[in-house]
UniProtKB/Swiss-Prot annotation:
Cofactor: Zn(2+)
Record keywords, A-Z: ATP-binding, DNA-binding, Metal-binding, Nucleotide-binding, Repressor, Transcription, Transcription regulation, Zinc, Zinc-finger
Family note: Belongs to the NrdR family.
Chain ranges passing through the membrane: none
Gene: nrdR
Protein name (Swiss-Prot/TrEMBL): Transcriptional repressor NrdR
InterPro entries: ATP-cone_dom, NrdR-like_N, RNR_NrdR-like
Organism field: Xanthomonas campestris pv. campestris (strain ATCC 33913 / DSM 3586 / NCPPB 528 / LMG 568 / P 25)
Amino acid sequence: MHCPFCQHNDTRVIDSRVSEDGTTIRRRRECEACGERFSTLETIELKLPTVVKSDGGREAFDARKLRTSFDRALQKRPVSEEQIEAAVRAVVHQLRMSGEREVGSLRVGEYVMVELRKLDHVGYVRFASVYRSFQDVADFREEIEKLERELPVGSEQLPLLEAALERAGKPGKR
């Protein structure tokens, strides 16, 4: 590494310390030529893939755009900032772990939908309506019905079912 004081390219490491979170190493160095000391930081560089848009254009992955997508889908929904940040991190992690240099915007959208589905079903349907270009109410209905079919029936749903059966004149099971 070049010395920032005399530009000589021989320096030696005097001390190395790993940061608390284990993602950075601080190295104390000394120049062999002038004797000056300086510090460097070493971090892991994991490059995110380039996003290939549906029109064929390419752009660098932008985590802010990803966050904006989550924010729009979850606007006025009971989802915390921490939950949204965790979902963004999960998508970024998936992209990093893909090991690919390029990823289609459709795949990024699928990753987002997986995370939204875990967080909030209304947010999921909002995002799906834009992502899948819903044309009419039937498209919404179809997506909601698909979501309902895939959801496990929870114990909190049984009282609603019983109440509906009673209103219809059929005795509910107790």
